Amino acid sequence: MNTTIPVRLSERLNTPISTAELERRWKAVRAAMERDKIDVLLMQNNNDHMGGYVRFFTDVPATNGYPITVVFPRDDLMTVVMHGGFGMAQSLPPGGNGILRGVKKVLGTPSFACAPYTFSYDPELAAQALAPYAGGTIGLVSTYQMSFAMVDNLKRGAFANTRFVEATDLVDTIKAIKSAEEMQRIRDSAHM
């Protein structure tokens, strides 16, 4: 799935990863998903200090405690759930919006980890994006950074007959082997 359509990247991205590098990552992960018979990956981060799976897939970090959830299908573009107003649903053009690339839809909700009455907001939107995969296999990436509410809500709802597997190692083995671009970023960081 080639999503390379020239798009001007926003100045809001701090030293953005090239679209070609993102596509290399997505292709490698999708091949591993095919091998392991995983239909879709689900990941969630709420900070950029540890893990960074959201950033690895989207080039946008989760920050300041606001959760970002990524639904990464084996055969389609991503859906991202992030902080926003109730009912926020934005379809992105091919190539992205200057910030998000490889994403077909952004769903928003005003969820806060410190407000327990919002615990179901993110899972409800993730469930919308995961609906085509009910009864299939969902790979959970970085379960130690995913809220209990996310997985609990999914497993008790429409996904009760869905197979959930730990998929962090699937992604980590790909993340561990650095491309030339990633190696240059590491050198640039070390140089500072």
Protein language model features and the residues they cover:
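A composition/biophysics-driven feature that prefers long, compositionally simple stretches
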Residues: M1-M192
